[in-house]
């Protein structure tokens, strides 16, 4: 531990001061402290000093300087979460200034896609809802085994995934809600399909009902209007009451016959008999 030239602190002490001022939120004082550091390359390449410079640049709205710092040095993984927040928040602020309104979830997603995290502060693993895929895999595997972990199990999961107990609890709660909603939707679709099937089954007989009705109408339709022979027969029957019973019986027989030709012959026989009798009576 050697003292820095013309400066009363060692490199480790400088790093400690930067961390203490950051945690205390004394960012203006931190900025003045960084400005007072001597021009020493190995001091200004110290990770704690670089992180402090990034925090001060964000605090002052100097986002270009912030991006330059974050992209020019390979930071340790334990510093990634803090520096990733600075990167994203800075891009959110710039996007909100351009659009003139706060960003929603979709707007922030588009910003993240447009300005992906640099590999200097990101290990390259995809994240989803701020959870790494490895952490989500652990949670999904446990959920399949037990959707309701105990408080002790939640603490163990938090340690295994690097998340907080609250984050683990919220993940399980949200996952259960999504599954319940999916089950309710599936039941609704099943009920709708069953209802549709029942309606189709009820309507199916009507498809053939038309032909049944048609045949019924034809079967029970009134007989055709009497032809000219039938009219003459009726007139002859009315003129000669003695032949009425014979004519009516012949008419009934003609109605019961299905063949058109037989129907006509029977009408002629029934007609000629009474007419002949009538002519004989008139001649006498």
Curated annotation (Swiss-Prot):
Coiled coil: none
DNA-binding region residue numbers: 124-183
Compartmental location: Nucleus; Cytoplasm
Record region (Disordered): 168-230
One record GO biological process: ectodermal placode development
Superkingdom assignment: Eukaryota
One GO term describing the cellular component: transcription regulator complex
Gene3D superfamilies documented for this protein: Homeodomain-like
Pfam families: Homeobox_KN (PF05920), SIX1_SD (PF16878)
GO molecular function: DNA-binding transcription factor activity, RNA polymerase II-specific; RNA polymerase II cis-regulatory region sequence-specific DNA binding
Sequence ranges of Basic and acidic residues compositional bias: 179-190
InterPro entries named among the record's database cross-references: HD (IPR001356), Homeobox_CS (IPR017970), Homeodomain-like_sf (IPR009057), KN_HD (IPR008422), SIX1_SD (IPR031701)
Record function comment: Transcription factor that is involved in the regulation of cell proliferation, apoptosis and embryonic development. Depending on context, functions as a transcriptional repressor or activator. Required for the normal formation of pre-placodal ectoderm.
Annotated protein name in UniProt: Homeobox protein six1
Organism: Xenopus laevis (African clawed frog)
Gene: six1
């Amino acid at each position: 531990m050697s003292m820095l030239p013309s400066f009363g602190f060692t490199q480790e002490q400088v790093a400690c001061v930067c961390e203490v001022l950051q945690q205390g939120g004394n960012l203006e004082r931190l900025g003045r402290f960084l400005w007072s550091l001597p021009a020493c390359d190995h001091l200004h390449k110290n990770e704690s000093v670089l992180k402090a410079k990034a925090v001060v640049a964000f605090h002052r709205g100097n986002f270009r300087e912030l991006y330059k710092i974050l992209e020019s040095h390979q930071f340790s993984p334990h510093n990634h979460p803090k520096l990733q927040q600075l990167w994203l928040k800075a891009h959110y602020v710039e996007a909100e200034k351009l659009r003139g309104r706060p960003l929603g979830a979709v707007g922030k997603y588009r910003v993240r896609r447009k300005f992906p995290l640099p590999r200097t502060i990101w290990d390259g693993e995809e994240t989803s809802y701020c959870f790494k895929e490895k952490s989500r895999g652990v949670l999904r595997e446990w959920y399949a085994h037990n959707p309701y972990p105990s408080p002790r199990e939640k603490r163990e999961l938090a340690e295994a995934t690097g998340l907080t107990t609250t984050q683990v609890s919220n993940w399980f709660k949200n996952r259960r809600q999504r599954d319940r909603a999916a089950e309710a939707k599936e039941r609704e679709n099943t009920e709708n399909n069953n209802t549709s099937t029942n309606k189709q089954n009820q309507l199916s007989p009507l498809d053939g009902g038309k032909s049944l009705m048609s045949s019924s109408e034809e079967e029970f339709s009134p007989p055709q209007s009497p032809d000219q022979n039938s009219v003459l027969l009726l007139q002859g029957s009315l003129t000669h009451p003695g032949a009425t019973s014979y004519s009516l019986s012949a008419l009934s027989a003609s109605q019961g016959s299905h063949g058109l030709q037989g129907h006509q012959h029977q009408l002629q026989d029934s007609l000629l008999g009474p007419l002949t009798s009538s002519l004989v009576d008139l001649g006498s």
